Amino acid sequence: QGIRDLTAELSKIAYQEESGRTTKKMINHAISWLQESHIIGYASKAVDCDYKQIKDNSRYYFLDMGIAYYFLSRTGAPYDVMKGLLTENFVYLVLRRRIENTHEIAGLVPWFASYEKIKGELDFYVRSLVDYKNYGIEVKSTDASAKTARKLLEDGKLDYLYLLKGETMGGIADGRIFTVPLCLADRIEFELSKVL
């Protein structure tokens, strides 16, 4: 019954018989409904990894991994693309939970970051409320280079970088880059300046 109600309600919002057109207002109503129903949540964007330049509601994530998998599998996306999107969604949920349950991360929702200088993006950006340092999180289901994240670190926009990967044993590179298995995302710390 719930699924039929959801479909009927979304159809009313997204499609009007009179016009046959989908408008921006209709799409915004549908997104609002999905948010209020706790089906999706949003991430805000930090421009150039600056916690003072935040743009709200910039990216959406599913709040349930099963629903995320279902909808992604219906798109016909290749397995590697689905795997990458699901791993990023998983980390979003971990960060969201930590923001709601602890006082270690700035913001009301997780942030991702853009780097205008090179037109790149960082999967997640964390401003620590413990040591007041900037942390980058790059989520990789495969062994990719994380060029934007490394450039942000090199240019002093980030203090530390976590590379979360699906198939790794973990490790440290140069003292500021940490490779962590994806399954340990909930255990990464945002107080490294106090530890190192």
Predicted regions and their residues:
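Surface-exposed, flexible loop/turn segments at secondary-structure boundaries
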Residues: 48, 68, 132, 144, ...
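Active-site beta-strand-loop-beta-strand hairpin of nuclease catalytic cores
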Residues: 126-136
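Amphipathic, soluble alpha/beta structural segments
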Residues: 116-124, 187-196
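Short, glycine/charged-rich beta-strand-loop motifs at protein surfaces that mediate ligand recognition
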Residues: 80-81, 136-140
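Solvent-exposed adhesion/ligand-recognition segments of exported proteins
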Residues: 2, 177-178, 191-196
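Catalytic cores of nucleic-acid endonucleases
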Residues: 140-187
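Accessory nucleic acid-recognition modules appended to NTPase machines
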Residues: 1-122, 126-128
